[in-house]
Amino acid sequence: MKVDLPESRLPSLYRDFRPLKDLNPDGYEANISTWRDFFLQQYISNSNRIIFTIGTRTLQELTHEVYGVPKSIDIAIDVLVNEGNLIPMELFNLGGMYTDNSRKGFWKWVRSWKESTNMYKSRKDETNFYLREDKFIIKANLEKEYQRFHELLKRSVFMEASSITDLVFTRNEFVTTESLQSFFSTYDEETKNVFLHFIENYKHIIVSKDNVIKVIAAEVEDITSRFSKGITENDLRIASVKVGIININKQITRLRKEINESNIKLRGPEFNELPKRIRIEYKQARLLSEKHLSRLLKFQNNLAQVRTQIDTSATNAVLIQTLSESNEVIKSINGYIGSTEKVEDLLDEIKEGHDRTEEVNDLLAHYNKGQDEEAEEEIERELEQLELDEKNNNKEENKNQDLHEPKESSSEDLLKRLNNLKINTNEGPVQDNENHDNEIRKIMMEEQPR
Protein backbone atom coordinates (compact mmCIF):
# COMPACT_ATOMS: atom_id res chain seq x y z
CA MET A 1 0.00 0.00 0.00
CA LYS A 2 1.05 3.59 -0.48
CA VAL A 3 2.39 5.03 2.76
CA ASP A 4 1.71 8.73 3.28
CA LEU A 5 4.78 9.65 5.31
CA PRO A 6 7.36 12.46 4.96
CA GLU A 7 9.71 11.30 2.19
CA SER A 8 12.78 12.87 3.78
CA ARG A 9 12.24 11.00 7.03
CA LEU A 10 11.54 7.54 5.65
CA PRO A 11 15.05 6.17 6.42
CA SER A 12 14.69 7.13 10.08
CA LEU A 13 11.07 6.00 10.35
CA TYR A 14 11.71 2.54 8.86
CA ARG A 15 14.82 1.63 10.76
CA ASP A 16 14.92 0.39 14.34
CA PHE A 17 14.91 3.76 16.08
CA ARG A 18 14.67 2.44 19.63
CA PRO A 19 18.34 3.28 20.36
CA LEU A 20 17.50 6.95 19.67
CA LYS A 21 15.67 7.10 22.99
CA ASP A 22 19.02 7.72 24.69
CA LEU A 23 21.10 9.00 21.77
CA ASN A 24 18.62 11.45 20.27
CA PRO A 25 15.47 11.80 22.41
CA ASP A 26 13.97 14.48 20.15
CA GLY A 27 14.34 12.31 17.05
CA TYR A 28 12.94 9.34 18.96
CA GLU A 29 9.83 11.28 20.02
CA ALA A 30 9.42 12.73 16.51
CA ASN A 31 9.40 9.25 14.95
CA ILE A 32 6.85 7.97 17.47
CA SER A 33 4.63 11.01 16.90
CA THR A 34 4.80 10.62 13.11
CA TRP A 35 3.82 6.93 13.19
CA ARG A 36 1.12 7.63 15.80
CA ASP A 37 -0.44 10.36 13.63
CA PHE A 38 -0.20 8.07 10.61
CA PHE A 39 -2.17 5.29 12.33
CA LEU A 40 -4.75 7.75 13.60
CA GLN A 41 -5.29 9.20 10.14
CA GLN A 42 -4.98 6.03 8.07
CA TYR A 43 -6.68 3.41 10.25
CA ILE A 44 -8.55 5.01 13.12
CA SER A 45 -10.07 8.47 12.64
CA ASN A 46 -10.69 8.32 8.90
CA SER A 47 -13.25 5.50 8.96
CA ASN A 48 -16.17 4.06 10.91
CA ARG A 49 -14.39 0.80 11.63
CA ILE A 50 -14.62 -0.39 15.21
CA ILE A 51 -11.93 -3.10 15.23
CA PHE A 52 -8.26 -2.49 14.46
CA THR A 53 -6.10 -5.56 13.83
CA ILE A 54 -2.30 -5.72 14.00
CA GLY A 55 0.14 -8.48 13.12
CA THR A 56 2.13 -9.78 10.21
CA ARG A 57 -0.36 -8.44 7.69
CA THR A 58 0.07 -4.91 9.07
CA LEU A 59 3.82 -5.10 8.59
CA GLN A 60 3.38 -6.46 5.07
CA GLU A 61 1.01 -3.63 4.15
CA LEU A 62 3.53 -1.04 5.38
CA THR A 63 6.56 -2.64 3.71
CA HIS A 64 8.47 -0.12 1.59
CA GLU A 65 10.11 -1.17 -1.67
CA VAL A 66 13.40 0.45 -0.62
CA TYR A 67 13.41 0.43 3.18
CA GLY A 68 11.53 -2.81 3.73
CA VAL A 69 9.49 -3.56 6.86
CA PRO A 70 9.19 -0.76 9.48
CA LYS A 71 11.26 -1.93 12.43
CA SER A 72 9.70 -0.01 15.34
CA ILE A 73 6.01 0.74 14.77
CA ASP A 74 5.19 -1.28 17.86
CA ILE A 75 6.19 1.73 19.96
CA ALA A 76 3.58 3.98 18.28
CA ILE A 77 0.92 1.28 18.69
CA ASP A 78 1.77 0.97 22.38
CA VAL A 79 1.36 4.74 22.76
CA LEU A 80 -2.10 4.61 21.17
CA VAL A 81 -3.06 1.83 23.59
CA ASN A 82 -1.68 3.61 26.63
CA GLU A 83 -3.46 6.83 25.61
CA GLY A 84 -6.77 4.97 25.48
CA ASN A 85 -7.35 5.40 21.74
CA LEU A 86 -7.04 1.64 21.23
CA ILE A 87 -8.55 -0.82 23.72
CA PRO A 88 -7.14 -4.38 23.62
CA MET A 89 -9.94 -6.77 22.74
CA GLU A 90 -9.34 -8.96 25.77
CA LEU A 91 -9.52 -5.97 28.06
CA PHE A 92 -12.71 -4.83 26.35
CA ASN A 93 -14.30 -8.24 26.88
CA LEU A 94 -13.30 -8.13 30.55
CA GLY A 95 -15.16 -4.83 31.01
CA GLY A 96 -12.11 -2.60 31.30
CA MET A 97 -12.78 -0.16 28.48
CA TYR A 98 -13.52 2.76 30.80
CA THR A 99 -10.99 1.90 33.49
CA ASP A 100 -8.72 4.83 34.28
CA ASN A 101 -5.33 4.02 32.73
CA SER A 102 -3.57 6.30 35.19
CA ARG A 103 -4.66 4.30 38.21
CA LYS A 104 -2.25 1.75 39.57
CA GLY A 105 -4.89 -0.95 39.61
CA PHE A 106 -5.43 -0.68 35.87
CA TRP A 107 -2.13 -2.16 34.74
CA LYS A 108 -2.19 -4.61 37.61
CA TRP A 109 -5.40 -5.83 36.06
CA VAL A 110 -3.84 -5.81 32.60
CA ARG A 111 -1.04 -8.04 33.88
CA SER A 112 -3.67 -10.55 34.93
CA TRP A 113 -4.49 -11.24 31.28
CA LYS A 114 -1.17 -10.31 29.66
CA GLU A 115 2.23 -11.48 30.81
CA SER A 116 3.45 -7.91 30.99
CA THR A 117 5.71 -6.44 33.60
CA ASN A 118 4.78 -2.84 32.85
CA MET A 119 2.34 -1.67 30.16
CA TYR A 120 0.87 -3.26 27.07
CA LYS A 121 3.51 -4.33 24.54
CA SER A 122 2.61 -5.10 20.94
CA ARG A 123 6.07 -6.54 20.15
CA LYS A 124 6.43 -10.29 20.60
CA ASP A 125 10.05 -10.84 19.51
CA GLU A 126 12.96 -9.44 17.49
CA THR A 127 12.14 -11.08 14.16
CA ASN A 128 11.16 -9.23 10.99
CA PHE A 129 7.48 -9.86 11.72
CA TYR A 130 7.65 -8.90 15.35
CA LEU A 131 4.07 -7.70 16.00
CA ARG A 132 1.60 -9.72 18.06
CA GLU A 133 -1.52 -10.90 16.30
CA ASP A 134 -3.87 -8.72 18.31
CA LYS A 135 -7.17 -6.88 17.92
CA PHE A 136 -8.20 -3.58 19.41
CA ILE A 137 -11.39 -1.61 19.85
CA ILE A 138 -11.20 1.89 18.38
CA LYS A 139 -12.83 3.65 21.30
CA ALA A 140 -13.81 6.93 19.63
CA ASN A 141 -15.39 5.17 16.64
CA LEU A 142 -17.34 2.76 18.84
CA GLU A 143 -18.79 5.62 20.86
CA LYS A 144 -19.65 7.57 17.70
CA GLU A 145 -21.40 4.55 16.19
CA TYR A 146 -23.30 4.03 19.41
CA GLN A 147 -24.78 7.52 19.16
CA ARG A 148 -26.00 6.75 15.65
CA PHE A 149 -27.43 3.41 16.79
CA HIS A 150 -29.19 4.96 19.77
CA GLU A 151 -30.96 7.49 17.55
CA LEU A 152 -32.25 4.69 15.32
CA LEU A 153 -33.38 2.67 18.33
CA LYS A 154 -35.13 5.71 19.79
CA ARG A 155 -37.10 6.39 16.61
CA SER A 156 -38.19 2.76 16.26
CA VAL A 157 -38.25 0.44 19.26
CA PHE A 158 -38.47 3.08 21.98
CA MET A 159 -41.31 4.99 20.33
CA GLU A 160 -43.28 2.03 18.94
CA ALA A 161 -43.04 -0.53 21.76
CA SER A 162 -46.30 -1.04 23.64
CA SER A 163 -45.83 -4.54 25.08
CA ILE A 164 -43.10 -6.92 26.20
CA THR A 165 -43.35 -8.76 22.87
CA ASP A 166 -42.09 -5.61 21.15
CA LEU A 167 -38.91 -5.75 23.22
CA VAL A 168 -37.94 -9.42 22.82
CA PHE A 169 -36.05 -10.57 19.70
CA THR A 170 -33.88 -13.33 18.46
CA ARG A 171 -30.40 -12.08 17.70
CA ASN A 172 -30.97 -12.37 13.96
CA GLU A 173 -34.31 -10.55 14.16
CA PHE A 174 -32.71 -7.73 16.17
CA VAL A 175 -29.89 -7.05 13.69
CA THR A 176 -32.13 -7.46 10.63
CA THR A 177 -35.21 -5.61 11.84
CA GLU A 178 -36.18 -2.91 9.37
CA SER A 179 -35.20 0.06 11.52
CA LEU A 180 -31.74 -1.33 12.44
CA GLN A 181 -30.80 -3.30 9.33
CA SER A 182 -29.14 -0.32 7.66
CA PHE A 183 -26.91 0.08 10.71
CA PHE A 184 -25.79 -3.54 11.13
CA SER A 185 -25.55 -4.32 7.42
CA THR A 186 -22.19 -2.53 7.17
CA TYR A 187 -20.62 -4.75 9.85
CA ASP A 188 -19.15 -8.21 9.62
CA GLU A 189 -20.15 -10.82 12.18
CA GLU A 190 -17.27 -10.06 14.52
CA THR A 191 -18.06 -6.34 14.59
CA LYS A 192 -21.73 -7.09 15.27
CA ASN A 193 -20.72 -9.21 18.26
CA VAL A 194 -18.48 -6.44 19.56
CA PHE A 195 -21.21 -3.84 19.26
CA LEU A 196 -23.84 -6.05 20.90
CA HIS A 197 -21.39 -6.74 23.73
CA PHE A 198 -20.86 -3.00 24.13
CA ILE A 199 -24.54 -2.05 24.33
CA GLU A 200 -25.21 -4.91 26.75
CA ASN A 201 -22.26 -4.68 29.14
CA TYR A 202 -21.32 -1.00 28.92
CA LYS A 203 -24.51 0.84 27.98
CA HIS A 204 -27.04 -1.61 29.49
CA ILE A 205 -29.46 -1.20 26.60
CA ILE A 206 -30.09 -4.94 26.18
CA VAL A 207 -29.66 -8.30 27.92
CA SER A 208 -29.06 -11.54 26.02
CA LYS A 209 -29.23 -15.29 26.57
CA ASP A 210 -29.43 -18.31 24.28
CA ASN A 211 -29.53 -16.19 21.13
CA VAL A 212 -32.39 -14.07 22.52
CA ILE A 213 -32.13 -10.31 23.08
CA LYS A 214 -34.40 -8.19 25.27
CA VAL A 215 -34.32 -4.39 25.24
CA ILE A 216 -34.20 -3.03 28.80
CA ALA A 217 -33.21 0.60 28.20
CA ALA A 218 -34.44 3.30 30.56
CA GLU A 219 -36.63 4.65 27.75
CA VAL A 220 -38.88 1.54 27.93
CA GLU A 221 -38.89 1.18 31.69
CA ASP A 222 -42.65 1.72 31.78
CA ILE A 223 -42.93 -1.71 30.10
CA THR A 224 -39.96 -3.62 31.54
CA SER A 225 -40.52 -2.49 35.14
CA ARG A 226 -43.35 -5.04 35.43
CA PHE A 227 -41.16 -7.91 34.29
CA SER A 228 -37.80 -9.46 35.05
CA LYS A 229 -34.75 -7.59 33.76
CA GLY A 230 -33.15 -10.86 32.72
CA ILE A 231 -34.13 -13.32 29.99
CA THR A 232 -36.91 -15.56 31.32
CA GLU A 233 -38.53 -18.71 29.96
CA ASN A 234 -41.46 -16.60 28.82
CA ASP A 235 -39.06 -14.39 26.87
CA LEU A 236 -37.65 -17.47 25.12
CA ARG A 237 -41.18 -18.57 24.22
CA ILE A 238 -42.08 -15.12 22.93
CA ALA A 239 -38.96 -15.13 20.77
CA SER A 240 -39.92 -18.58 19.46
CA VAL A 241 -43.39 -17.37 18.46
CA LYS A 242 -41.94 -14.33 16.71
CA VAL A 243 -39.44 -16.53 14.83
CA GLY A 244 -42.32 -18.73 13.69
CA ILE A 245 -44.19 -15.69 12.39
CA ILE A 246 -41.09 -14.44 10.57
CA ASN A 247 -40.42 -17.82 8.93
CA ILE A 248 -44.02 -18.21 7.81
CA ASN A 249 -43.99 -14.68 6.38
CA LYS A 250 -40.90 -15.57 4.36
CA GLN A 251 -42.57 -18.72 3.00
CA ILE A 252 -45.73 -16.79 2.15
CA THR A 253 -43.69 -14.21 0.26
CA ARG A 254 -41.89 -16.94 -1.68
CA LEU A 255 -45.11 -18.80 -2.56
CA ARG A 256 -46.84 -15.64 -3.73
CA LYS A 257 -43.94 -14.94 -6.02
CA GLU A 258 -44.07 -18.48 -7.43
CA ILE A 259 -47.83 -18.30 -7.98
CA ASN A 260 -47.55 -14.95 -9.77
CA GLU A 261 -44.83 -16.32 -12.04
CA SER A 262 -46.94 -19.43 -12.72
CA ASN A 263 -49.99 -17.33 -13.61
CA ILE A 264 -47.92 -15.29 -16.06
CA LYS A 265 -46.68 -18.48 -17.70
CA LEU A 266 -50.16 -20.01 -17.89
CA ARG A 267 -51.52 -16.92 -19.63
CA GLY A 268 -48.63 -16.69 -22.07
CA PRO A 269 -49.04 -17.61 -25.77
CA GLU A 270 -46.32 -20.25 -25.52
CA PHE A 271 -48.23 -22.18 -22.87
CA ASN A 272 -50.91 -23.35 -25.31
CA GLU A 273 -48.22 -24.78 -27.58
CA LEU A 274 -47.03 -27.15 -24.84
CA PRO A 275 -48.27 -30.75 -24.75
CA LYS A 276 -51.48 -31.25 -22.81
CA ARG A 277 -49.81 -33.42 -20.17
CA ILE A 278 -47.26 -30.68 -19.38
CA ARG A 279 -49.95 -28.03 -19.23
CA ILE A 280 -51.84 -30.16 -16.71
CA GLU A 281 -48.70 -30.51 -14.58
CA TYR A 282 -48.20 -26.75 -14.57
CA LYS A 283 -51.76 -26.18 -13.44
CA GLN A 284 -51.47 -28.84 -10.74
CA ALA A 285 -48.27 -27.23 -9.48
CA ARG A 286 -50.02 -23.88 -9.23
CA LEU A 287 -52.95 -25.45 -7.37
CA LEU A 288 -50.57 -27.13 -4.92
CA SER A 289 -48.82 -23.81 -4.32
CA GLU A 290 -52.14 -22.10 -3.71
CA LYS A 291 -53.19 -24.82 -1.22
CA HIS A 292 -49.88 -24.55 0.57
CA LEU A 293 -50.25 -20.76 0.65
CA SER A 294 -53.71 -21.15 2.15
CA ARG A 295 -52.35 -23.36 4.94
CA LEU A 296 -49.51 -20.95 5.63
CA LEU A 297 -51.94 -18.06 5.87
CA LYS A 298 -53.91 -20.03 8.46
CA PHE A 299 -50.72 -20.70 10.40
CA GLN A 300 -49.84 -17.04 10.15
CA ASN A 301 -53.22 -16.04 11.53
CA ASN A 302 -52.91 -18.58 14.35
CA LEU A 303 -49.49 -17.31 15.37
CA ALA A 304 -50.65 -13.72 15.10
CA GLN A 305 -53.53 -14.60 17.39
CA VAL A 306 -51.11 -16.25 19.82
CA ARG A 307 -48.99 -13.10 19.89
CA THR A 308 -52.09 -11.01 20.46
CA GLN A 309 -53.05 -13.27 23.35
CA ILE A 310 -49.56 -12.91 24.80
CA ASP A 311 -49.83 -9.14 24.53
CA THR A 312 -53.28 -9.25 26.14
CA SER A 313 -52.06 -11.49 28.94
CA ALA A 314 -49.09 -9.23 29.55
CA THR A 315 -51.41 -6.22 29.60
CA ASN A 316 -53.75 -8.03 31.99
CA ALA A 317 -50.82 -8.86 34.25
CA VAL A 318 -49.81 -5.22 34.29
CA LEU A 319 -53.42 -4.17 34.89
CA ILE A 320 -53.84 -6.61 37.77
CA GLN A 321 -50.61 -5.44 39.35
CA THR A 322 -51.67 -1.83 38.90
CA LEU A 323 -55.07 -2.51 40.46
CA SER A 324 -53.43 -4.37 43.32
CA GLU A 325 -51.08 -1.48 43.99
CA SER A 326 -53.97 0.99 43.71
CA ASN A 327 -55.93 -1.07 46.22
CA GLU A 328 -53.01 -0.98 48.63
CA VAL A 329 -52.82 2.80 48.26
CA ILE A 330 -56.54 3.17 48.93
CA LYS A 331 -56.33 0.89 51.97
CA SER A 332 -53.37 2.83 53.28
CA ILE A 333 -55.15 6.17 52.88
CA ASN A 334 -58.33 4.82 54.47
CA GLY A 335 -56.26 3.45 57.33
CA TYR A 336 -54.79 6.89 57.85
CA ILE A 337 -58.24 8.48 57.79
CA GLY A 338 -59.61 6.06 60.40
CA SER A 339 -63.13 4.76 61.08
CA THR A 340 -66.36 6.43 59.96
CA GLU A 341 -67.18 7.28 63.60
CA LYS A 342 -63.91 9.16 63.81
CA VAL A 343 -64.76 11.07 60.64
CA GLU A 344 -68.24 11.92 62.00
CA ASP A 345 -66.75 13.21 65.25
CA LEU A 346 -64.31 15.28 63.24
CA LEU A 347 -67.14 16.77 61.16
CA ASP A 348 -69.14 17.56 64.33
CA GLU A 349 -66.14 19.34 65.80
CA ILE A 350 -65.71 21.30 62.59
CA LYS A 351 -69.41 22.32 62.64
CA GLU A 352 -69.20 23.35 66.29
CA GLY A 353 -66.12 25.40 65.54
CA HIS A 354 -67.91 27.01 62.60
CA ASP A 355 -70.92 27.97 64.74
CA ARG A 356 -68.66 29.47 67.40
CA THR A 357 -66.86 31.45 64.74
CA GLU A 358 -70.18 32.87 63.49
CA GLU A 359 -71.13 33.98 67.02
CA VAL A 360 -67.83 35.76 67.46
CA ASN A 361 -68.30 37.42 64.06
CA ASP A 362 -71.76 38.69 65.11
CA LEU A 363 -70.38 40.14 68.35
CA LEU A 364 -67.56 41.85 66.56
CA ALA A 365 -69.94 43.16 63.92
CA HIS A 366 -72.24 44.69 66.63
CA TYR A 367 -69.26 46.27 68.38
CA ASN A 368 -67.98 47.70 65.15
CA LYS A 369 -71.45 49.00 64.30
CA GLY A 370 -71.58 51.06 67.54
CA GLN A 371 -68.18 52.50 66.83
CA ASP A 372 -69.20 53.29 63.27
CA GLU A 373 -72.34 55.18 64.47
CA GLU A 374 -70.29 57.31 66.86
CA ALA A 375 -67.83 58.07 64.11
CA GLU A 376 -70.66 59.04 61.75
CA GLU A 377 -72.20 61.41 64.33
CA GLU A 378 -68.85 63.08 64.86
CA ILE A 379 -68.45 63.51 61.12
CA GLU A 380 -71.96 65.01 60.86
CA ARG A 381 -71.14 67.58 63.57
CA GLU A 382 -67.94 68.52 61.82
CA LEU A 383 -69.80 68.93 58.51
CA GLU A 384 -72.43 71.18 60.13
CA GLN A 385 -69.73 73.35 61.67
CA LEU A 386 -67.98 73.58 58.29
CA GLU A 387 -71.25 74.66 56.62
CA LEU A 388 -71.85 77.30 59.33
CA ASP A 389 -68.34 78.67 58.97
CA GLU A 390 -68.77 78.82 55.22
CA LYS A 391 -72.02 80.80 55.55
CA ASN A 392 -70.39 83.33 57.91
CA ASN A 393 -67.52 83.75 55.49
CA ASN A 394 -69.95 84.39 52.65
CA LYS A 395 -71.76 87.06 54.70
CA GLU A 396 -68.52 88.83 55.49
CA GLU A 397 -67.52 88.80 51.84
CA ASN A 398 -70.90 90.24 50.79
CA LYS A 399 -70.61 93.01 53.37
CA ASN A 400 -67.18 94.03 52.10
CA GLN A 401 -68.47 93.98 48.58
CA ASP A 402 -71.34 96.34 49.51
CA LEU A 403 -68.86 98.84 50.94
CA HIS A 404 -67.09 99.09 47.61
CA GLU A 405 -70.20 99.21 45.44
CA PRO A 406 -71.42 102.83 46.43
CA LYS A 407 -68.10 104.29 45.53
CA GLU A 408 -68.29 102.62 42.20
CA SER A 409 -71.86 103.77 41.65
CA SER A 410 -71.03 107.34 42.68
CA SER A 411 -68.21 107.36 40.19
CA GLU A 412 -70.58 106.23 37.52
CA ASP A 413 -73.11 108.95 38.51
CA LEU A 414 -70.39 111.54 38.35
CA LEU A 415 -69.52 110.51 34.83
CA LYS A 416 -73.16 110.65 33.80
CA ARG A 417 -73.73 114.05 35.33
CA LEU A 418 -70.60 115.41 33.74
CA ASN A 419 -71.71 114.12 30.40
CA ASN A 420 -75.06 115.80 30.81
CA LEU A 421 -73.44 119.11 31.28
CA LYS A 422 -73.45 121.12 28.10
CA ILE A 423 -70.91 123.74 27.35
CA ASN A 424 -72.45 126.71 25.60
CA THR A 425 -70.12 127.90 22.89
CA ASN A 426 -72.23 130.97 22.32
CA GLU A 427 -71.54 134.01 24.38
CA GLY A 428 -74.26 134.41 26.91
CA PRO A 429 -74.86 136.14 30.16
CA VAL A 430 -72.11 135.83 32.66
CA GLN A 431 -74.58 134.73 35.22
CA ASP A 432 -75.27 131.59 33.27
CA ASN A 433 -71.57 130.71 33.25
CA GLU A 434 -71.32 131.33 36.92
CA ASN A 435 -74.27 129.08 37.51
CA HIS A 436 -72.60 126.40 35.44
CA ASP A 437 -69.37 126.65 37.40
CA ASN A 438 -71.23 126.54 40.64
CA GLU A 439 -72.94 123.35 39.58
CA ILE A 440 -69.62 121.72 38.73
CA ARG A 441 -68.17 122.68 42.09
CA LYS A 442 -71.23 121.29 43.77
CA ILE A 443 -70.82 117.98 42.00
CA MET A 444 -67.16 117.75 42.86
CA MET A 445 -67.86 118.57 46.49
CA GLU A 446 -70.33 115.77 46.64
CA GLU A 447 -67.70 113.38 45.40
CA GLN A 448 -65.17 114.33 48.07
CA PRO A 449 -64.59 111.49 50.47
CA ARG A 450 -66.57 111.82 53.60
Swiss-Prot record:
Residues 387-439 are annotated as: Disordered. One of its GO terms (molecular function) is phosphatidic acid binding. It comes from the Eukaryota. One of its GO terms (biological process) is late endosome to vacuole transport via multivesicular body sorting pathway. Residues 387-416 have a biased composition (Basic and acidic residues). Pfam families: Snf7. InterPro entries: Snf7_fam. One of its GO terms (cellular component) is cytoplasmic side of plasma membrane. Present with 2530 molecules/cell in log phase SD medium. PANTHER family: BCDNA.GH08385 (PTHR22761:SF96), CHARGED MULTIVESICULAR BODY PROTEIN (PTHR22761). This is Uncharacterized protein YJL049W. It comes from Saccharomyces cerevisiae (strain ATCC 204508 / S288c).
